Amino acid sequence: MAHPKRKMSKSKRDSRRAQTFKLSLPGIVECPQCHEMKLAHRVCKDCGYYDGKEIVSKEN
């Protein structure tokens, strides 16, 4: 079986591992109706529109 020739430092080991555990950012886009930031492919929490149609009626 293969054995490491040199001891790997903790910082070298951890920096290599950090690449696999990266978190991806959620897709945040601007709402075309009210221009607020919202999650992509979801109803806007401010105006209630999705794909140009009013899904949730927002009453003031």
Swiss-Prot record:
UniProt GO BP: translation
Keyword Ribosomal protein belongs to the record: yes
Pfam families membership: Ribosomal_L32p (PF01783)
GO cellular component: large ribosomal subunit
Keywords, sorted A to Z: Ribonucleoprotein, Ribosomal protein
Protein family per UniProt: Belongs to the bacterial ribosomal protein bL32 family.
Name of the protein this chain belongs to: Large ribosomal subunit protein bL32
Taxonomic lineage from the root: Bacteria, Bacillati, Bacillota, Clostridia, Eubacteriales
